[in-house]
Amino acid sequence: MRLGISALLFNLDKALELCREVDRINHIEVGIDNLDECIKLSKYKGEFDKLNLSLGIHLPMELNSCENIKYIRKSWIDFINKFEDGLKDLNIEYFNMHL
């Protein structure tokens, strides 16, 4: 079983410090909102690997996968696909979004 914590990019260093201190933490979910943040998050790959952390991504709160307007709903899917491509080197376990 995995025990995880969540973080945003601005406090990821502090979250990783906690992961180093508490061996039981083996998962981290990082909230990112913009595609350019994929590059910033990718710089932490070595640290994730070193700590043997699985990784999940919390997508922007504004996402609505049940959007009634088809064009907008499809744009969210395209957005998620771009996130996945931008993070392909990180072995993301899942993407999390709220309805």
What would you call each of these model-derived segments?
Residues F83-E84, K88-L99:
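Active-site groove signature of glycoside hydrolases
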Residues M1-K88:
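N-terminal pre-domain/capping segments
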